[in-house]
Swiss-Prot record, chain A:
Alphabetical keyword list: Acetylation, Membrane, Mitochondrion, Mitochondrion inner membrane, Transmembrane, Transmembrane helix
GO annotations of cellular component type: MIB complex; MICOS complex; mitochondrial crista junction; mitochondrial inner membrane; mitochondrion; SAM complex
Membrane spanning residue stretches: 17-36
Keyword Cytoplasm set for record: no
Localization: Mitochondrion inner membrane
Name of the protein described by the UniProt record: MICOS complex subunit MIC10
Species name: Homo sapiens
Residues recorded with modification N-acetylserine: S2
Primary gene name: MICOS10
Length: 78, 118
């Protein structure tokens, strides 16, 4: 794995971690305010779940160096 | 009767807010693969600052307040990768020459002590 590819993977991992932890935290806030009487545990639970998902994605990304990241391109109807 | 209807309404409102948040997360694929999360973060970085600026302009127009222009944040350039790599190379070269340098300095020290005791 070249250094630039490694750098890109680290960037992707960090961005993924930020998004997932933030999303988990946000969902925790919503559920804490709506159903769980402003308790703290939904926030911790959501953030922890986001962190775990990000760690799992990063681990898979670093352990599978031969997978290519592509994107779907829709066929244009003529 | 009214209390029951009101508690049912409250539950429906809370349920719709929570369900809307869950649907938004599912639709934007925020908890999906890392590519989608990275794309969502990039899109947020492009969309949020102009939206905040437009909102502040709208608030200024409606209230007549003038928000002072903040100075631009200083651009700090610190290449972590280069300094880390340089640090690693320095440590490894120091470790590789450490035995010969130690031998040289101890020999010099011994010669010095010998010369002083004569």
């Amino acid at each position: 794995m070249s250094e630039s590819e490694l750098g890109r993977k680290w960037d992707r991992c960090l961005a993924d971690a930020v998004v997932k932890i933030g999303t988990g935290f946000g969902l925790g806030i919503v559920f804490s305010l709506t159903f769980f009487k402003r308790r703290m545990w939904p926030l911790a639970f959501g953030s922890g779940m986001g962190l775990g998902m990000a760690y799992s994605n990063c681990q898979h990304d670093f352990q599978a160096p031969y997978l290519l990241h592509g994107k779907y391109v829709k066929e244009q109807e003529q | 009767m009214v209390a029951r209807v009101w508690s049912l309404m409250r539950f429906l409102i809370k349920g719709s807010v929570a369900g809307g948040a869950v649907y938004l997360v599912y639709d934007q694929e925020l908890l999906g693969p890392s590519d989608k999360s990275q794309a969502a973060l990039q899109k947020a970085g492009e969309v949020v600052p102009p939206a905040m600026y437009q909102f502040s302009q709208y608030v200024c127009q409606q209230t007549g307040l003038q928000i002072p222009q903040l100075p631009a944040p200083p651009k700090i350039y610190f290449p972590i990768r280069d300094s880390w790599n340089a640090g690693i190379m320095m440590v490894m070269s120091a470790l590789s020459v450490a035995p010969s340098k130690a031998r040289e300095y101890s020999k010099e020290g011994w010669e010095y002590v010998k010369a002083r005791t004569k």
